[in-house]
Amino acid sequence: MGSKTPNDHRRGPNVESSPHAAIDTINPPKHAAASGLLHGPLEGETEDGEDEDDDKTGADLKSVGQLNNSTKKKNKRKKNKKKKKTLLGGLQTTPPRVALSSIFYDQRYPEAEIVGYTTNNDNLQRITAEEFRHLCVVNDMDDEFLNDYRKAAEVHRQVRQYVQTITKPGIAMSQLAQEIEDGVRALTDHQGIETGDALKAGMAFPTGLCLNNIGAHWTPNPGAKEVILQYDDVLKVDFGVHVNGRIVDSAYTMAFNPVYDDLLTAVKAATNTGLKEAGIDARIDCISEAIQEVMESYEVELNRKIIPVKAVRNITGHNILRYKIHGDKQVPFVKTHTNQRMEEGDIFAIETFGSTGKAYLDDDIGIYGYFCDEHASAAGLHHSSAKSLLKTIKDNFGTLVFSRRYLERLGVKSYHLGMRSLVSKGIVQSYAPLVDVPGSYVAQFEHTVLLRPNCKEVISRGDDY
């Protein structure tokens, strides 16, 4: 989910970088069996884990008749046990609706892409104050932290890989959003209906389904006109999954007309460049320049015109905090002046947006979602509807971004007046859709990366992108 660039964002001098080097993967992606999606007995074992050779002990002491009877009994016993192999325990359904806790029996979720750090001489100087400030974050990177993140990432992978198979011209945006959100809630095993349940696990923010020149922050809203996917559309799918507030934010773009292939290739390459350059002590301005250099080396031919792919200037990648999709650091896609560095323990959403238009996104009409200030107080609110709505928001979403669709799913009614009051008081912030000029096309790719002490883990990486 893109973070809008602040008004004082400035462009700066060039910094040399090498964005085209490949990422050295320490451990390649696991197959389904390796990641716990398939379960069965090991070779030479029964379903109960018994070794078949153990039954042979003492066989030479038996008579021939006893051996025959024993063999028949063992064959009969094995035949009955083989029936267990036909059960679907440990397998995912299509569409994915089995909670991951029922698939990964030991509740240990697979690692994502592990990448070793590349040491740069100019990055050896550490800043003691920043180390101290982030010490608590690093200490939180324990087994529970990693397992929560890996579970959220596995949910994201399974849901999106199914959704990609049904995303075709003619499908409604509301159906896609429903499939994604139903899948996430089923796999996390938290439907989010009971008070506070959505804070345990589920959607981290409303599903973003942005077409063509809509760059970010659009989702189907109740009562709005239905939008149907067309063959010539460029669709960006951006959704987040959280487990105990640990948010995985990842996005991809789909297009059916091959004329947009170079646009998608440019943006995907730029995102991978950002992931390669990311690391402990990495300078954010260097990462930004590397991203822009790669993205703007591409062109796309539309209507017999060669159009350069441009990096969007006023939306950025961002760090992620617990229960907060946008932290206090930003990663632009263009050259910039900043002294900020990435630090050990940081979690970043490395995303890039490329456009065939002016590459500057403006607010459009409508509302994508809402975000509640964690320090918000009901003091000063005069409308009872606003007070009641604020309590519902805090109890069910906290600081997670939510949409009108989520409120109505909870059974909240007649909330418009109360919401206007909360927004006007600055207690709740609204997000508008962000658009480039009409007739242009915007693409997006995004991954979440954990900057662990000894390596970085591209937690949302999958076989699809």
From Swiss-Prot:
- Please name the PROSITE patterns in this protein's record: MAP_2 (PS01202)
Subcellular location field: Cytoplasm
Positions with a binding annotation for a divalent metal cation 1: 238, 249, 446
Domain of life the protein comes from: Eukaryota
Could you give one GO CC term from the UniProt record? Answer: cytoplasm
Q: Name one GO molecular function term.
A: metalloaminopeptidase activity
Q: What does this protein's record comment on cofactor binding?
A: Binds 2 divalent metal cations per subunit. Has a high-affinity and a low affinity metal-binding site. The true nature of the physiological cofactor is under debate. The enzyme is active with cobalt, zinc, manganese or divalent iron ions. Most likely, methionine aminopeptidases function as mononuclear Fe(2+)-metalloproteases under physiological conditions, and the catalytically relevant metal-binding site has been assigned to the histidine-containing high-affinity site.
Query: Which GO annotations describe the biological process of this protein?
Result: proteolysis
Class in the EC hierarchy, top level: hydrolase
* Sorted UniProt keywords: Aminopeptidase, Cytoplasm, Hydrolase, Metal-binding, Protease
Instruction: Write down the required cofactor(s).
Output: Co(2+); Zn(2+); Mn(2+); Fe(2+)
Identify its protein family.
Answer: Belongs to the peptidase M24A family. Methionine aminopeptidase eukaryotic type 2 subfamily.
Q: What does this protein do?
A: Cotranslationally removes the N-terminal methionine from nascent proteins. The N-terminal methionine is often cleaved when the second residue in the primary sequence is small and uncharged (Met-Ala-, Cys, Gly, Pro, Ser, Thr, or Val).
In its UniProt entry, what is this protein called?
Answer: Methionine aminopeptidase 2-2
User: What taxonomic ancestry is recorded?
Assistant: Eukaryota, Fungi, Dikarya, Ascomycota, Pezizomycotina
